[in-house]
Amino acid sequence: MSHIVKIYDTCIGCTQCVRACPLDVLEMVPWDGCKAEQMASAPRTEDCVGCKRCESACPTDFLSVRVYTSSESTRSMGLAY
């Protein structure tokens, strides 16, 4: 099953999600809009198994990183009936 990893602009650049991922799906990239001047990125989503350890590790009130199955992502965008 394919998964979609979304990183939101609430990311504080703490690297907790990157360190929690057992498959190195996430990495930190430079980002001017973030306090820490870096933000999580998910360049290898094809390796994501949906364990959601990144979500559990995120310390922000609104999770900055979310993992969806393809069908969940489609539903959340209002594209499925």
Swiss-Prot record:
InterPro entries: 4Fe4S_Fe-S-bd, 4Fe4S_Fe_S_CS, PSI_iron-sulfur_center, PSI_PsaC. It comes from the Eukaryota. One of its GO terms (biological process) is photosynthetic electron transport in photosystem I. Its main location: plastid. GO terms for cellular component: chloroplast thylakoid membrane; photosystem I. Binds 2 [4Fe-4S] clusters. Cluster 2 is most probably the spectroscopically characterized electron acceptor FA and cluster 1 is most probably FB. Its cofactor is [4Fe-4S] cluster. GO terms for molecular function: 4 iron, 4 sulfur cluster binding; electron transfer activity; metal ion binding; oxidoreductase activity. Keywords: 4Fe-4S, Chloroplast, Electron transport, Iron, Iron-sulfur, Membrane, Metal-binding, Oxidoreductase, Photosynthesis, Photosystem I, Plastid, Repeat, Thylakoid, Transport. It catalyses: reduced [plastocyanin] + hnu + oxidized [2Fe-2S]-[ferredoxin] = oxidized [plastocyanin] + reduced [2Fe-2S]-[ferredoxin]. It is an enzyme of class 1 (oxidoreductase). [4Fe-4S] cluster 2 binds at C21, C48, C51, C54. Coiled coil: none annotated. It is found in: Plastid, Chloroplast thylakoid membrane. Its EC number is 1.97.1.12. PANTHER family: PHOTOSYSTEM I IRON-SULFUR CENTER, PHOTOSYSTEM I IRON-SULFUR CENTER-RELATED. Apoprotein for the two 4Fe-4S centers FA and FB of photosystem I (PSI); essential for photochemical activity. FB is the terminal electron acceptor of PSI, donating electrons to ferredoxin. The C-terminus interacts with PsaA/B/D and helps assemble the protein into the PSI complex. Required for binding of PsaD and PsaE to PSI. PSI is a plastocyanin/cytochrome c6-ferredoxin oxidoreductase, converting photonic excitation into a charge separation, which transfers an electron from the donor P700 chlorophyll pair to the spectroscopically characterized acceptors A0, A1, FX, FA and FB in turn. The eukaryotic PSI reaction center is composed of at least 11 subunits. HAMAP family: PSI_PsaC. This is Photosystem I iron-sulfur center.
